[in-house]
Amino acid sequence: MSRMNEGTTARILLVDDHPMMRRGLRDLLELESDLEVVGEAGNGEDAIHLAQQTEPDLILMDLNMPGIDGLETTRRMRDADIDARIVMFTVSDEQSHVLEALRNGADGYLLKDMDAE
């Protein structure tokens, strides 16, 4: 896995089936000069293909997507030797999902805060 050094740009792949979520994340991440969104995917199959093409440092992965879900996508990415850090980014706070994500190769689990404050 490539390690980030001072002065380098982190390459990020966004994986979520909701285009508005991807757009919002992209807009926020691109406010930082050391973060670059290198691709977006709306499903697991496209995510695997893009990860192989773009070789991101970080993948933000939604859990619930049509076709193969984020858990299976993560497992397939690890089986394909995709070594980017994978962080599940989801509304699900079920302990079983957290544990399964980590078992399938995720490096972290981040909750989408959906409460309006």
What residues fall within each predicted segment?
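Conserved acidic segment of CheY-like receiver
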Residues: T9-M21, L25-L29
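Active-site residues of response regulator receiver
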Residues: D16, D62, T90
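Short hydrophobic/Thr-rich beta-strand motif most characteristic of the beta2 strand and flanking loop
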Residues: D34-G42, L50
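Acidic catalytic/metal-coordinating carboxylates
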Residues: N43-D46, I68-E72
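Short amphipathic alpha-helix used as the core "switch/output" element in two-component signaling
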Residues: H49, L71-D83
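Active-site beta3 strand of CheY-like receiver
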Residues: T54-L60
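Receiver (REC) domain active-site loop signature in two-component systems and cognate sites
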Residues: M65
